[in-house]
Amino acid sequence: MNFLLTLAYDGTNYCGFQVQPNGRSVAAVFQDALEAVLGTRPDIKGCSRTDAGVHALGFRLNFHAGTRIPPEKLPLALNQHLPPDIRVLAARVVPEDFHARYAAHTKTYLYRIHNHPIDSPFDAAYYTRMPKHLDEVRMQAAAQQFVGTHDFLALCAAGSSAAAHGDTVRTITDCHVTRRGDEIDIEVTADGYLYNMVRILAGTLCEVGAGRMQPEQIPGILAGCDRSQAGPTLPAKGLFLKCVEYPDMKENHS
């Protein structure tokens, strides 16, 4: 059977989702739990390769395994063998040819900013602090300029294989900025992403919010395909993979 699982994890203590030769990855720890529960170590296919320090609220992965454990019982069974910073939220059976990455229709990322001169001692690992006041109205105006199908090379970090192959066109279907008190959330939904794209996009919006860029500059930055014209790459700790949507699948958020 092919199982699709939804995970949430705190990426602080991991080198990312993907198995790495010299680092503790979410995938390796999850495979340890699978082996403890199933007696085998199946290959797992993640929906994304989240980087070191990036968190997930609704990460999707699938694997093939033969087990008598019903899917609704898998979360509890696996969570008993996982550390507290990784949790299985839901499980279901999907078609044999389903692939969590290639079947994804859209992925939504959330970037959290604490806009205050003083850091919080409680959740500083889950946002990036910006001490200077940011104008969220200007940021929202700039965010709308990213919506659509564009060449996002200007928002791509150096060393990207996609950039090397000229594969840098993506479609953003939604990009918006909201403020709640001192917290600013940047949410982006797209059909795919380039390396560090969301962190650079968030950094660019912060430049606009701080008055160092104008919202009207965004189309020119995208058209120029020049990384140096966009904003800085913000830290990984403020980034969350929020959800992954699949076409024709009910209960996409479960």
Predicted regions and their residues:
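Structured-RNA-binding interfaces characteristic of tRNA pseudouridine synthases
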Residues: 1-254
